[in-house]
Amino acid sequence: MTATTITPETKDEVVGVGRVVRVIGPVVDVEFPAGQLPEILNALHVDAEVMGETHAITLEVALHIGENVVRAISLKPTDGMRRGTEVRDTGAPISVPVGDVTKGHVWNVTGDVLNADPSTIEVTERWPIHRDPPAFDDLEPETEMLETGIKVLDLLTPYVKGGKIGLFGGAGVGKTVLIQEMIYRIAHNFGGTSVFAGVGERTREGNDLINEMDEAGVLKDTALVFGQMDEPPGTRLRIALTGLTMAEYFRDVQNQDVLLFIDNIFRFSQAGSEVSTLLGRMPSAVGYQPNLADEMGQLQERITSTRGHSITSMQAVYVPADDYTDPAPATTFAHLDATTELSREIASRGLYPAVDPLTSTSRILDPLYVGQEHYDTATQVKQILQRNKELQDIIAILGVDELSEEDKVTVARARRIQQFLSQNTYTAEKFTGVAGSTVPIADTVEGFQMICRGDVDHIPEQAFFNVGSMDMVMENWDKMKKEG
């Protein structure tokens, strides 16, 4: 599918009219006159009446089943739809608004605004949600690190500009705050835009997110699209494409670096499985759709860097029953460049962002990409933390005093590293009262080198808590000395 622009005037154009012949839940069969059969993925419009009110319903053509009949998936409940109801073929795929008009607003899968009066929104351009990925010649050949200014991310799990990051974490470990912080930093440090796609979001979660983003002052820089948990599977399957299409416009037309959040990518696979079952396809492993890898690839291949500009994606990944071999998360992992795992144990100690430094990974934590000094420092930090983890059982039974002198030093430095990995964030300022900080990667590497070398062994570990660079540690240490 090309990047054809669909103007607001042509989005409701009718190129053919058919009639509903069968409705089974969200699956609708529609018969068209000979020669007017709509193409696969075309959007069809139907008006259904429920309790005296007429509702517009959008269908998407999924199959041609013969005898001038198409099988379509409804993106809204099919209540009120009857046999013989008129169906209008738009002659084009579902299209959504793109551009600055999307920022600060909440949209559904078909591009209807949800948090404002539609008459107050002036949409000048729409793009179809089904588009080809960038041509190979247009891709950015160099791998570049996205410097976030967050120490733990930049040092231990560096993000690729135009890459895909998997975000793992249960409820209450700081996932939403980290998402908001990344949106803030992309807007203020890079002048970029963020798009949030809620795939199968709980209504309460979506509402809380919008309110929190508004309070944090990042809503104005963000376009939000939601296909909620109570909506038909067709909506949940396509909502990620709606968000991605908006992000592609910011990248390709406005030449911005874009941050795309998908929460939750597992529900994208789950919705595809439901649609596949509704269409009568033979299930594959563990009941998933046979085209799982294909559907995932069509989404992920569009998330990339073109020359000079990028879409960087953070995708929340739910792992069913913590089974990493499940086909849905396993298919997602094949596309990820970095994984950021949020730890409940670290969060319980009040250390935020609660990123687990030992289980989080990155493809570019390699001297070839980040440089030898960065790589050596990250490796040394991980070795100290790993040794500290191994010593915890001994400490729990015998106490720190029974350790060798070398191990005592290791534990003391590990505790300073753990404290120094915490950082004051901009969006959490209202909770902590501490202003946010952006730490350049060179300062981050130098700070952790000082801890690993023992240059700051004389400074109490409290001075390292919730700070930015090592300069702030020194300021805290000076205050502590003055206070006696």
Swiss-Prot record:
Major localisation: membrane
Reaction it catalyzes: ATP + H2O + 4 H(+)(in) = ADP + phosphate + 5 H(+)(out)
Domain of life: Bacteria
Sequence positions that bind ATP: G169, G170, A171, G172, V173, G174, K175, T176
EC numbers, comma separated: 7.1.2.2
GO molecular-function terms, A-Z: ATP binding; ATP hydrolysis activity; proton-transporting ATP synthase activity, rotational mechanism
InterPro entries: AAA+_ATPase, ATP-synt_VA_C, ATP_synth_F1_bsu, ATPase_a/bsu_AS, ATPase_alpha/beta_chains, ATPase_F1/V1/A1_a/bsu_N, ATPase_F1/V1/A1_a/bsu_N_sf, ATPase_F1/V1/A1_a/bsu_nucl-bd
Membrane topology term: Peripheral membrane protein
UniProt function note: Produces ATP from ADP in the presence of a proton gradient across the membrane. The catalytic sites are hosted primarily by the beta subunits.
Oligomeric form and interacting partners: F-type ATPases have 2 components, CF(1) - the catalytic core - and CF(0) - the membrane proton channel. CF(1) has five subunits: alpha(3), beta(3), gamma(1), delta(1), epsilon(1). CF(0) has three main subunits: a(1), b(2) and c(9-12). The alpha and beta chains form an alternating ring which encloses part of the gamma chain. CF(1) is attached to CF(0) by a central stalk formed by the gamma and epsilon chains, while a peripheral stalk is formed by the delta and b chains.
Similarity annotation: Belongs to the ATPase alpha/beta chains family.
Protein name per the record: ATP synthase subunit beta
Upper taxonomic lineage: Bacteria, Bacillati, Actinomycetota, Actinomycetes, Propionibacteriales
